[in-house]
Amino acid sequence: MAYLDPTLLILLVLAGLGIISHNMTVTLAILVLLAIRITPLNSYFPWVEKYGLSIGIVILTIGVMAPIASGKITASEVMHSFLHWKSLLAILIGVAVSWLGGRGVSLMSNQPSVVAGLLVGTVMGVALFRGVPVGPLIAAGLLSLLIGKT
């Protein structure tokens, strides 16, 4: 009987969830990971694990900041955001979410046993509910409030 790699099976199931839910983000990410896994590129997994999250956050930040950099959102609009209650609330929520993300990074580093559950939950949220894969850090931050930071 041929050996079936359980990790490949998990990745295939997750890719299938991405396809079924028409979520190209999940599908593409999982297919890239599958390609890395089954080729000699698999020796780069330690690098991907170490820097992938940071690179992803940089790319996400570029996407979020692009309207300011391109001039679509002007400097005066940014300054006026401090004068409206909705914008002030958005700033406060942004601060809170960033704080939660920081707690999440700490929890994921100090309690790696929770990472698998957070990742599965995030992929399910992305695949089934059209979410975006920023969930693990925020989910870990929320989890840290419930179970403690370390």
From Swiss-Prot:
Membrane-spanning parts: 1-21, 51-71, 82-102, 127-147
InterPro entries: UPF0756_TM (IPR007382)
Pfam name, any one: DUF441
Record keywords, A-Z: Cell membrane, Membrane, Transmembrane, Transmembrane helix
Entry membrane topology: Multi-pass membrane protein
Subcellular location: Cell membrane
GO cellular component: plasma membrane
UniProt similarity note: Belongs to the UPF0756 family.
Xref: HAMAP family: UPF0756
Entry protein name: UPF0756 membrane protein PC1_1142
Organism: Pectobacterium carotovorum subsp. carotovorum (strain PC1)
